[in-house]
A protein has these predicted regions:
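Carbohydrate-active enzyme catalytic cores, enriched for enzymes
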Residues: 1-100, 151-152, 283, 288-294, ...
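Catalytic Cys-His active-site segments of thiol-dependent hydrolases/isopeptidases
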Residues: 101-106
Length: 340
């Protein structure tokens, strides 16, 4: 059995987990230094690309949570190893002080069945599955990478390539391309473009998760997330005119340990007496294909929208009738992006 850092003292702190070193730095070095002068968050950039770890953070009103729309998008060269999850090209969206599109699941304790078989897995993220299979978990080679990060007059674009992460979980050579573009338009709403290319036909699942309420309208191809006050409307648009079959579940495929969700530990780890099962949405392609192209338009609102979101495919672009009464034409390809 490896001795704990406390037992080893200062010996070998460069080779083991460093709580002892952190204690020394904090109490005997850093504590004597003055605190930095506070600065308003609004002085910082609204968007930032952390190139070394493959994370992109986008805000509309940084430092004003009641007005802010915040998206985090990840496609990381560090893979899914150790504490990382199988979440390349996944995103979360919080708005107006509430969680809307979440990374679902819990970590009752490290490597619990729920943590290992749900929370670490791609199926717990706002991502995609190929034939019901996500990215390979716990593998440093299951990587992604940010391929574009661009700021335009009316948009911020981030593109990710998660091909290696999906390829490791499929037969060798089957996965040719899995990419996602995330476009933040007017710092107001999001357009997502998913492109998948396979050697043999396969189905695609498009996933979305929420804390409480999530409903699907098959006629309009629209999912609606409701938080305490705010909402997130998501409409799926297939350029080929295909419809998607949506299902909503309120159960984890691997449940939270009952000692934590219902027992004496629940009060210590949750704000309520029982952990929520959360809501899990999956839109399935109705047929297998070698190539898939899917757009999603996500409109967050501090209340229920007064007008519906209506998006359609026309002449190689998305025509988006916004709930605020405006109409945008969005063109998003590998080579070009425009918002008019």
């Amino acid at each position: 059995k490896r001795p704990s850092p406390a037992e080893r003292g200062l010996e070998g702190l460069d080779r083991i987990y460093p709580p002892s070193a952190e204690f020394l730095v904090r109490n005997f070095i850093a504590s004597s230094l003055p605190m930095p002068t506070p600065r308003p968050l609004s002085d910082l950039p609204r968007e930032r690309y952390f190139s070394d770890i493959g994370w992109v953070s986008l805000h509309s009103a940084l430092g004003e949570p009641d007005r802010d729309i915040h998206i985090t998008f990840v496609s990381s060269p560090y893979g899914s190893f150790s504490h990382s999850h199988a979440h390349q090209d996944a995103f979360v969206l919080n708005a107006f002080g509430e969680n809307l599109a979440i990374a679902s699941g819990y970590r009752e304790f490290h490597n619990s069945p729920h943590h290992d078989q749900w929370t670490r897995q791609t199926k717990s993220k706002n991502a995609i599955l190929i034939d019901g299979i996500g990215q390979k978990p716990q593998d440093k080679n299951a990587t992604g990478r940010i391929t574009r990060c661009q700021i335009g007059n009316r948009f911020v674009l981030s593109s990710g390539d998660a091909t290696p992460a999906y390829a490791l979980a499929q037969p060798k050579g089957r996965v040719k391309r899995v990419t996602r573009d995330l476009l933040f338009v007017d710092h107001r709403y999001v357009v997502i473009r998913d492109v998948v290319a396979l050697e043999t036909p396969g189905t695609l699942s498009w996933l979305l998760h929420a804390e409480n309420s999530l409903d699907w309208n098959p006629r309009t191809q629209t999912a609606l997330i409701r938080a305490a006050k705010s909402t997130l409307t998501t409409q799926l648009v297939s350029p080929d005119g295909g419809k998607w079959t949506g299902t909503v579940s309120d159960k984890f495929t691997t449940p939270v340990d009952p000692k934590y969700s219902q027992g004496n530990a629940a009060a210590s780890y949750s704000s309520g007496s029982k952990w929520s099962e959360q809501k899990h949405f999956s839109a399935e392609s109705q047929k297998a294909a070698k190539e898939h192209l899917l757009f999603a338009v996500l409109w967050p609102e501090p209340r229920t929208p007064e007008r519906p979101l209506k998006a359609s495919w026309k002449n190689g672009s998305l025509e988006i009738h916004r709930p605020d009464g405006r109409t945008d034409t969005v063109r998003l390809t590998d080579d070009a992006v425009s918002v008019q």
